[in-house]
Structure formats: structure tokens, C-alpha cells
Amino acid sequence: MLRDLFVKKKKYAAIPSEQVRKDVPDGVMTKCPKCKKIMYTKEVLKNLKVCVNCGYHHPMNAWERLDSILDEGSFREYDKEMVSLNPLEFPDYEEKLESDRKKTELNEAVVTGEGTIDDMLVVVAVMDSRFRMGSMGSVVGEKIARAVEKAYDLQVPFIIFTASGGARMQEGILSLMQMAKTSVALKKHSNAGGLFISVMTHPTTGGVSASFASLGDYNLAEPGALIGFAGRRVIEQTVREKLPEDFQTAEFLLEHGQLDAVVHRDDMRESLRKILEVHQGGEMAVWQS
């Protein structure tokens, strides 16, 4: 139109999106998925990967978790050399395993070993959701069972941090049988008076939640963790009802008696220390032959 000729247009400097991305190197900033606040990654790491604005607990890898709860330099790893094979010849499974090994620098989805918390010896297992979404295959189950047996032999408590999508479909029944294997090992440990502390982190689902994750003498969880067996949509379609908004969260499970406590990451080491201290010399520490 003619009037557009007499209207002074605003001038804008066009900045290519690629140029913007280059100005901020990858990994320098972290965006909270809950409150959407953008902050320096170093601040998030300094705060144990908890959002300083809303308290959202970002996922931790296995080594970060171990560093946050164990005495410095006390950890000794078990069964590091164990790796999964492809007994069912599932297509592309070996390639995916190798890709995850390179990406995570782990051989499997769980790290096991022994260490101390305030000089109290424990055997610990930490699942890492970066490796095949923390799914439980034959090696994951075997490493956890061996760790429990080591706790039995040493007559010390066993602690596990779970983060898993459930059983690993590429291993079929070999994966499902790990539910029984780990549960039997924990039963032996319990019958001997052994203490087992399970800490469920986001997410703990499927066969893991239906087996060893829920068998603790103390069942703890981090705030906001998703904990359940089947997915929300599957359950709603099955029962034909709308589920509560907070269904399958750690807080929901605590309210309904399925957890003993929801523990903030800042308080996790101290909470574990107190539990261990209470059971030193008590009934749970009386081992039977």
C-alpha cells in the first residue's frame, strides 16, 4: 500500500541461529525440565545435580552417585569385566551395546562394589540409566546377585540405587529370570540378618520395581521419582479410569504406605549413615550360620 512508503520500518539485525549456538559452548548451560530455568551447569553439578530454583533432581550417573554417598577413595569395584552377549541373536543388539559402552564408558547398566559411609563398610550397587535405559539383562542381574552374595559373605549391609526401564527385551526370558535370581539372593541375605536398603530414583519401573527394588528393609526414594510397573496409559486403558496426576510418583507411594521415606539428595548420605548406625550391633547385625 502507498502508506507503507511513508512509514519508517524498524531495522533488525538478523543473527543466524547457528551463530547463537556457537556463542554458548555445549555443556556450559543446563535447562531444568521442570521449571525451565537456565543455569550454569557447574552450579547444577555443585548442588548434586539438583535445580537451585525448583528442587528438581536431575539424573545422576553411577560415578556421581557413588561420589555423593561414599567416603572419598573408599570404593572398590566388583566384576567390572562382565559384558552382555547376544544369546538370542536379537538384531542390532550387539551394536547398541557397543554404542552405549563408548558413550558411557561402562560395560553394563550397573556398577557394583564395596565402600564405606562414615567408615562403615557396605556393598553397593548403582544402576545407570544412560546404558540401555538401565534395563536389566543377564549381566545386570548377575552383578547384583553377586554383590548381594558378597554382602552376605562380608556380613555387611547391601545398598542399591535403582534407575531402570525394566527387563531388557533383547534378552527375553534370560532377562526375566533375573527377577527371581536377585530376589533369592536377597532372601538369603535377609534370613542371615543382613540389612538391605533400596533407594529408588527416577525412573524405577517394570521388572526392577517388581523385584529387588521393592524388597528393602528400608525402601527410600528421591523426590519426584517415577516408580511403577506398567505405564500410566496402559493402566488407564485396563481399568478404564482416570488416574491421579501424581500417580506413580515417590510422594504418591509414600502417602499410600509403599515407601518408608522420600529423601532429598542433599540428605541422602546422612540418612543412610543414620540407618547404618542404628543397625550396628542391633538385631539386624546378628548373623546366623
UniProtKB/Swiss-Prot annotation:
Gene3D superfamilies (UniProt xref): 2-enoyl-CoA Hydratase, Chain A, domain 1 (3.90.226.10)
Catalytic activity from the UniProt record: N(6)-carboxybiotinyl-L-lysyl-[protein] + acetyl-CoA = N(6)-biotinyl-L-lysyl-[protein] + malonyl-CoA
Pathway: Lipid metabolism; malonyl-CoA biosynthesis; malonyl-CoA from acetyl-CoA: step 1/1
Recorded GO MF terms: acetyl-CoA carboxylase activity; ATP binding; carboxyl- or carbamoyltransferase activity; zinc ion binding
Key words, A-Z: ATP-binding, Cytoplasm, Fatty acid biosynthesis, Fatty acid metabolism, Lipid biosynthesis, Lipid metabolism, Metal-binding, Nucleotide-binding, Transferase, Zinc, Zinc-finger
Residues annotated as domain CoA carboxyltransferase N-terminal: 28-289
Subcellular location, record wording: Cytoplasm
Alphabetical list of InterPro entries matching this protein: AcCoA_carboxyl_beta (IPR034733), Acetyl_CoA_COase_Trfase_b_su (IPR000438), ClpP/crotonase-like_dom_sf (IPR029045), COA_CT_N (IPR011762), Znf-ACC (IPR041010)
Cofactor binding notes: Binds 1 zinc ion per subunit.
PROSITE patterns per UniProt: COA_CT_NTER
EC number: 2.1.3.15
Positions of C4-type zinc fingers: 32-54
Principal location listed in the UniProt entry: cytoplasm
Entry binding sites for Zn(2+): C32, C35, C51, C54
Gene Ontology CC annotation, any one: acetyl-CoA carboxylase complex
Cofactor: Zn(2+)
Gene Ontology BP terms: fatty acid biosynthetic process; malonyl-CoA biosynthetic process
Subunit structure: Acetyl-CoA carboxylase is a heterohexamer composed of biotin carboxyl carrier protein (AccB), biotin carboxylase (AccC) and two subunits each of ACCase subunit alpha (AccA) and ACCase subunit beta (AccD).
NCBIfam families reported for this sequence: accD
Family designation: Belongs to the AccD/PCCB family.
Annotated function: Component of the acetyl coenzyme A carboxylase (ACC) complex. Biotin carboxylase (BC) catalyzes the carboxylation of biotin on its carrier protein (BCCP) and then the CO(2) group is transferred by the transcarboxylase to acetyl-CoA to form malonyl-CoA.
Protein name: Acetyl-coenzyme A carboxylase carboxyl transferase subunit beta
Source organism phylogeny: Bacteria, Bacillati, Bacillota, Bacilli, Bacillales
Gene: accD
